[in-house]
Amino acid sequence: MACEIAADRVLAGRVSDNGEMVEMCASRELAPGSVVPDMIEANLRDRNSVYQTIRDSLASVGGRSRDVIAVLPDAAVRVALLGFDALPAKPDEAEAVVRFRLKKSLPFDVDKAKVSYHAQITGKGVRVVAAVVLSNVLEDYEAAFREAGYTPGVVLPSMLAALGAANAEQPTLVVKVDARTTSIAILDKNQLLLFRTLENSRGVTITGEQLAEEVYPSIVFFQDTYSLNLERIFIAGLPESGGAAPALQAQTGAEVRDLVSSSQLGMSTSPIPRWRMAGVVGALVS
């Protein structure tokens, strides 16, 4: 099972036995102000409400296990791509090198943070995808799951979780919008090449033209850096993702579609729209 805590709701899902689709899902709204995603300040302003909503959401998808993938808001986690010639073979030494590189780019003390990273070998060395969250922020989220009766064995920021739903063998842009952020990722051969999280003051009311304008600098940077053209674009988090298609197609010539496909969300009659479920679906089908 996977469960995402967003600013306005909790989403949960249970994967099918073959691991190819989410066969049950649930969504429960939170009272305004219950969760305020932030990298520094306390996120859970009404802990009782949050853990009760987690419990109700996961109970409704009916999983037998008490282990869950916890998906956190993107505004609470810093994700960075770092390049190295090489990393030390010992994990603790490698983490120390990653932490040192992160030090100057964070709005908080890296020594007070949890760091998780994945190293990708490239032709030029090592590319590291690092996720960083303040320890007290992470502990609050994990405690909410435990109070609800579940064990958060894996914890992911929403955008990194959502990437699990994308087939990115070809140059692929993934854009995910929420109430606080617009997250942009570009992948090729299922390797993450670019990752950015931008402040989003318009929330899900952002228009297709506005979204294309925000994304365009990242597209240009990718094309200039890698001499590749995007072939596919996936959108998540917008009720009318088709509204962004004409502007993005005009910029890139790439096909634009919803990130979560109908085949990945088995409950075709579910009242929960696919555009809300990217984090949960990606965490489970990756």
Regions found by a protein language model. Give the residues of each.
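Hydrophobic/aromatic-enriched cytosolic interaction surfaces used to assemble or bind macromolecules
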Residues: 1-286
